[in-house]
Amino acid sequence: MLPPREVVRLAHATGCTLLALTDHDHTGGLAEARAEAAALGMGFVNGVEISVTWRHRSVHIVGLDFDIENEALQNLLAQVRQGRLKRLAAIAAKLEKKGIVGAYDGALALAANPEMVSRTHIADYLIQAGHVRNKAQAFSKYLGDGKPASVAHEWASLEDCVAAIKGAGGLAVIAHPMRYGFSATAKRNLFEEFKALGGDGIEVHSGNCDKNDRLNYALLAERFGLMAGCGSDFHRLGDYSGGTLGACPELPPDCKPVWASFQTA
């Protein structure tokens, strides 16, 4: 896992001039990232990616350009992080019933930030302990929906998430909407509800999505009166499940970029 300053340096090396660091449910790296961006002459805005439950489905909402000291936002993020630990304990208890011990402590030991522990870290522990060969098997055998160690989890509500971001003076953007596998009806319902709650935009490009995705979501952004975001979805070096740092192509014509509304960049 790269420290925030290294992420900023890598972005700078790609020619990136404006950056938002959007760790999941945590803002602890923003001060370090902002200082490094300033030293390199880059624009920087505060960011965070918040886990949300919407109609029993998991959705991620990116908050941008907000006041990091806002108490309501920080309280919401703390609640989400505490929920991760509660879920880990429940999963570990189910695994123990299957004869797999040590998952709680093992997953925490593998997480760079214990507050940000996830099923991926549990999968890493299962691999390390020799219970499965790879992450795919960890999810298909134990951790996936409906499997023996599956634990449903309620993240923040969409309403509370958007309210917290807006209350902190920020912009709320739906992250990587092309990755959820939603039907056309579900997408319409999500975008309409998000807009009605005060949401600002959707990511028109994210990670490794293709040109057709960009054009499709640009049209959807225009249709629902939402601004367009663009993110690389970079997670770590060598992890190709996201995207390449700094790889954000130009937005399709007629998009209103979310960064045009930034106040602190």
What would you call each of these model-derived segments?
Residues 36-192, 254-258, 263:
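Extended substrate/RNA-proximal surfaces in nucleic-acid metabolism proteins
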